[in-house]
Design a protein with these regions (language model features):
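N-terminal intrinsically disordered/low-complexity leader segments
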Residues: 1-16, 205-211
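Hydrophobic/aromatic-rich alpha-helical bundle segments in the mid-to-C-terminal region
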Residues: 124-130, 134, 148-211
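Short coil/turn segments at alpha/beta junctions that flank glycine-rich nucleotide-binding fingerprints
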Residues: 31-35, 85, 150
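Short, basic, alpha-helical segments at the C-terminal edge of helix-turn-helix-like DNA-binding modules
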Residues: 69-74
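Amphipathic alpha-helical segments used for helix-helix packing
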Residues: 92, 105-126
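Helix-turn-helix
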Residues: 20, 24-62, 66
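Hydrophobic alpha-helical connector segments
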Residues: 66, 77-109, 161-165, 187, ...
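Solvent-exposed, amphipathic alpha-helical segments
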Residues: 20, 24-32, 78-82, 111, ...
Length: 211
C-alpha cells in the first residue's frame, strides 16, 4: 500500500516562513497551551514537513520561550494602553484590577502557569518568565508611584506593594483555572485587600465604567 505524499510546500522568503512558524506557535499556545508547541504540531499547523520547521527553528525551546514572551508582552501592552488614558492613578489601578480579574484572560493565564512549571527545566523559558514578571511589576509600580506622588495612595514601598499585588492577581487567576471562585469574588477580594494596602476607603477601587 502506498503512503500519502505530502504536497510540496510553497516557496516563501525566509522572513515569511519564520513569521508563519511564529504565528503557528502563537496560535497553538493560546489554543492548547505551551506544551502543545512541538515540532510536529507546528509543522502540521502550517502543512509543511517537520524538517522545514527545524530548518528555521533548530531549537524548539527557544521557540517556546519566544512564543511565551510575545503572548504575555502583548497582554501587558494591551492593559497598559487600556489604563494609560484614565485621568488618575486610582482610576488606572481600578481599571487594571477589573480587566485582569474578570475571567476573560484565562488563555493567557494558562500560558503563565505552564511557563512557571516548564521553566523549572527550561532555562530559556525561565529567563523569559523572569523578564516578563519584571515588566509587569514595573508597570504596576509606575501606577502606584504616581498615586503616591499625587497623594491618592499611601505606601512607603511602591515596588514591594507592586510585587504583592502581582502575586495576588497571579494566584487568584491560577486558582480560577480549576473553577475556584467566580470573577466577581476574585475582583472584590483583591480590590478590598489593595485598598487596605494603599490607605484607601473601602470601595475606592470598585470597577470603573470605561466608555
Amino acid at each position: 500500500m502506498s503512503s500519502p505524499t505530502r504536497k510540496k510546500a510553497a516557496r516563501k522568503s525566509p522572513a515569511e516562513r519564520a513569521a508563519e512558524i511564529a504565528d503557528a506557535a502563537h496560535e497553538l499556545a493560546l489554543e492548547q497551551g505551551l506544551a502543545a508547541v512541538t515540532l510536529r504540531a507546528v509543522a502540521a499547523r502550517i502543512d509543511v514537513a517537520p524538517a522545514l520547521v527545524a530548518h528555521y527553528e533548530p531549537d524548539m525551546q527557544a521557540l517556546i520561550a519566544s512564543t511565551f514572551a510575545s503572548i504575555v508582552a502583548a497582554e501587558l501592552a494591551e492593559v497598559d494602553a487600556l489604563v494609560a488614558g484614565l485621568p488618575t492613578p486610582r482610576k488606572r489601578l481600578a481599571a487594571m484590577l477589573a480587566t485582569l480579574l474578570d475571567g476573560s484572560r484565562d488563555d493567557v493565564t494558562v500560558i503563565w502557569v505552564e511557563a512557571w512549571a516548564m521553566g523549572r527545566r527550561k532555562e530559556a523559558l525561565a529567563a523569559g518568565v523572569r523578564d516578563q514578571m519584571d515588566a509587569w511589576q514595573a508597570m504596576i509600580r509606575g501606577v502606584l508611584e504616581a498615586g503616591v506622588a499625587s497623594g491618592e495612595f499611601e505606601t512607603d514601598d511602591p515596588a514591594a506593594a507592586a510585587w504583592q499585588l502581582l502575586g495576588m492577581i497571579d494566584g487568584l487567576n491560577a486558582q480560577a483555572l480549576v473553577r475556584w471562585g467566580d470573577a466577581a469574588d476574585r475582583g472584590s477580594l483583591t480590590s478590598h485587600a489593595v485598598e487596605g494596602m494603599l490607605g484607601l476607603e473601602r470601595g475606592a477601587l470598585a470597577p470603573p465604567v470605561i466608555e
